[in-house]
């Protein structure tokens, strides 16, 4: 499991450097177990640009960087370990609004956003798809 998360962080670095195949990056995200902070009975997310972003982290160090600025202070951050595929295939469609996945958002030069488009989320909820999500452009 840890190896899979490390592989995703490596693919993100390669992509940010201009290399790697974007499809391979999406595949690695889908196979990776991400740590997603839990708050108020749900997964921690932010809204930006008309999109709700579920925040996931590749390891506890990346989650800790996030918690320094957004955590509950003196309490540990609770999180769920979720497969990337489950996030984009099940959780995103259940939100009922344009939503994507933001990975390692507190890591300088190491974050990656997986937007609500065909090939990342199901076509029915993708903002560029032909389903119900097509009318919900951000």
Predicted regions and their residues:
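An interfacial alpha-helical scaffold signature
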Residues: 1-138
């Amino acid at each position: 499991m840890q190896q899979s998360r490390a592989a995703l962080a490596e693919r993100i670095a390669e992509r940010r450097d201009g290399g790697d195949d974007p499809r391979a990056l999406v595949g690695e995200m889908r196979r990776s177990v991400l740590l997603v902070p839990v708050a108020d009975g749900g997964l921690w997310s932010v809204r930006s640009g008309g999109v709700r972003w579920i925040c996931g982290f590749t390891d506890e160090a990346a989650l800790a960087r996030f918690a320094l600025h957004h955590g509950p202070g003196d309490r540990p951050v609770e999180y769920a370990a979720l497969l990337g595929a489950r996030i984009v295939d099940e959780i995103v469609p259940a939100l009922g609004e344009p939503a994507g996945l933001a990975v390692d958002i507190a890591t300088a030069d190491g974050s990656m956003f997986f937007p609500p488009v065909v090939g990342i989320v199901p076509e029915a909820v993708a903002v560029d798809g032909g389903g119900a999500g097509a009318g919900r452009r951000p």
